[in-house]
């Protein structure tokens, strides 16, 4: 059986709709560029779907592994405590198992965006837009 990967983009969430739109558009762009992967978006607070609801949305997709990636710039309590708890991750390996379609499959958790040259370029681009 070949591996079919699901990617869960995790956003913070907000009472304002723009936050959901941005994270959902990022997930849609990833899906368009990488059609062999199943891409979902979920949110930590104030926005649906929740992370748990987004994980449930992988049912019926045939995924054999899920990679959860926070769409956050830096680590905070959601990254270090809340998301690992939701995903039931082993604190030493950052890996866990979740049930999809009645089967236990591995889930791993990526790092926040952090410093990256592309982000630095984007910040500079945004500055130039208002110059």
From Swiss-Prot:
* Pathway(s) this gene product operates in, as recorded in its UniProt entry: Cofactor biosynthesis; adenosylcobalamin biosynthesis; cob(II)yrinate a,c-diamide from sirohydrochlorin (anaerobic route): step 1/10
Matches recorded under NCBIfam families: F430_CfbA, PRK00923.1
Q: Which reaction does it catalyse?
A: Co-sirohydrochlorin + 2 H(+) = sirohydrochlorin + Co(2+); Ni-sirohydrochlorin + 2 H(+) = sirohydrochlorin + Ni(2+)
Per the UniProt entry, the Enzyme Commission number(s) are: 4.99.1.3, 4.99.1.11
Chain residues that bind Co(2+): 12, 78
What is the documented function of this protein? Catalyzes the insertion of Co(2+) into sirohydrochlorin as part of the anaerobic pathway to cobalamin biosynthesis. Involved in the biosynthesis of the unique nickel-containing tetrapyrrole coenzyme F430, the prosthetic group of methyl-coenzyme M reductase (MCR), which plays a key role in methanogenesis and anaerobic methane oxidation. Catalyzes the insertion of Ni(2+) into sirohydrochlorin to yield Ni-sirohydrochlorin.
| Pfam families per record | CbiX
Protein's recorded name:
Sirohydrochlorin cobaltochelatase
């Amino acid at each position: 059986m070949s591996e079919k990967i699901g990617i869960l983009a995790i956003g913070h969430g907000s009472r304002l709709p723009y936050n959901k739109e941005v994270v959902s558009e990022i997930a849609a762009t990833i899906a368009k560029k990488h059609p062999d992967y199943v891409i979902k978006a979920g949110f930590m607070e104030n926005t649906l779907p929740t992370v748990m609801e987004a994980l449930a949305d992988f049912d019926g997709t045939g995924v054999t592994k899920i990679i959860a990636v926070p769409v956050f710039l830096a680590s905070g309590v959601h990254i270090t405590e809340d998301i690992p708890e939701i995903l039931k991750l082993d604190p030493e390996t950052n890996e866990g198992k979740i049930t999809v379609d009645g089967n236990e499959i591995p889930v791993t958790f990526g790092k926040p965006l952090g410093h990256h040259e592309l982000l630095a370029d984007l910040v500079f681009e945004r500055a130039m837009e208002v110059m």
